[in-house]
Amino acid sequence: MTHQTHAYHMVNPSPWPLTGALSALLMTSGLAMWFHFNSVTLLTLGLTTNMLTMYQWWRDIIRESTFQGHHTPTVQKGLRYGMILFIISEVLFFTGFFWAFYHSSLAPTPELGGCWPPTGISPLNPLEVPLLNTSVLLASGVSITWAHHSLMEGNRNHMLQALFITIALGVYFTLLQASEYYEAPFTISDGIYGSTFFVATGFHGLHVIIGSTFLIVCFFRQLKFHFTSNHHFGFEAAAWYWHFVDVVWLFLYVSIYWWGS
């Protein structure tokens, strides 16, 4: 093994950025094929490639951070900056969706009947499933904070319990959202209301699924004693991401479900 006189991690050549880019191309093309031609072959191929890429890329990172010891405090600091920038980019994504929603709703065009919601649209009741979803996500925010505090205090059992509760609440939220979509009296093709509603809430739902997957990985890593009270960036990143998902939902609830109805 060569002697290293700096704190940085010199990453080995990896195929995963290439396969990740390929999977993104397949997924976006597959989504267009699904919407226009009702064919899910390309989308399924893209999702499969994406899942395999993520699994193997994260496996490599976990190996580098644990067994190979490449994640020095300096490297961890760089990863933290990276996660913060990633969350900022996600904020800008949602800013675009909120912009589209408010641009359409604050000054409805004559084609929409000059009113919001547009003529013929029956909006969902914000005091039913959406309010329950809000409670579920707020509760999950409390449980992820409990998990973080338990980890800092070295209480492994409480950390696992809190993490399991957070994952269960995330899955419950996803199931509630799926049932709401199934029963909604409008679709994504119902003009600007359907488009902005399903794109904004659907993109958020995708983030909940990604966040739940992130937390499930952390749960299994904690079972294998990967985290300590002073070295647990993987969990910290998952917690930051989950709080971001939480805050975005509050804005979605107030804007689209409550004010927009």
From Swiss-Prot:
Assigned protein family: Belongs to the cytochrome c oxidase subunit 3 family.
Transmembrane regions listed in the UniProt entry: 16-34, 41-66, 73-105, 129-152, 156-183, 191-223, 233-256
EC code: 7.1.1.9
Entry's localization field: Mitochondrion inner membrane
Name of the gene: MT-CO3
Catalytic reaction annotation: 4 Fe(II)-[cytochrome c] + O2 + 8 H(+)(in) = 4 Fe(III)-[cytochrome c] + 2 H2O + 4 H(+)(out)
The organism's taxonomic lineage, starting at the top: Eukaryota, Metazoa, Chordata, Craniata, Vertebrata
InterPro entries from the UniProt entry: Cyt_c/ubiquinol_Oxase_su3, Cyt_c_oxase_su3_dom, Cyt_c_oxidase-like_su3, Cyt_c_oxidase_su3-like_sf, Cyt_c_oxidase_su3_a-hlx
Cited function: Component of the cytochrome c oxidase, the last enzyme in the mitochondrial electron transport chain which drives oxidative phosphorylation. The respiratory chain contains 3 multisubunit complexes succinate dehydrogenase (complex II, CII), ubiquinol-cytochrome c oxidoreductase (cytochrome b-c1 complex, complex III, CIII) and cytochrome c oxidase (complex IV, CIV), that cooperate to transfer electrons derived from NADH and succinate to molecular oxygen, creating an electrochemical gradient over the inner membrane that drives transmembrane transport and the ATP synthase.
Subunit structure: Component of the cytochrome c oxidase (complex IV, CIV), a multisubunit enzyme composed of 14 subunits. The complex is composed of a catalytic core of 3 subunits MT-CO1, MT-CO2 and MT-CO3, encoded in the mitochondrial DNA, and 11 supernumerary subunits COX4I, COX5A, COX5B, COX6A, COX6B, COX6C, COX7A, COX7B, COX7C, COX8 and NDUFA4, which are encoded in the nuclear genome.
Mitochondrial matrix-side segments: 1-15, 67-72, 153-155, 224-232
Membrane topology term: Multi-pass membrane protein
UniProt GO molecular function: cytochrome-c oxidase activity
Mitochondrial intermembrane side: 35-40, 106-128, 184-190, 257-261
Recorded GO CC terms: mitochondrial inner membrane; respiratory chain complex IV
Primary enzyme class: translocase
Annotated CDD domains: Cyt_c_Oxidase_III
BP-aspect Gene Ontology terms: mitochondrial electron transport, cytochrome c to oxygen; respiratory chain complex IV assembly
Keywords: Membrane, Mitochondrion, Mitochondrion inner membrane, Translocase, Transmembrane, Transmembrane helix
Stated name of the protein: Cytochrome c oxidase subunit 3
Gene3D superfamilies: 1.10.287.70, Cytochrome c oxidase, subunit III, four-helix bundle
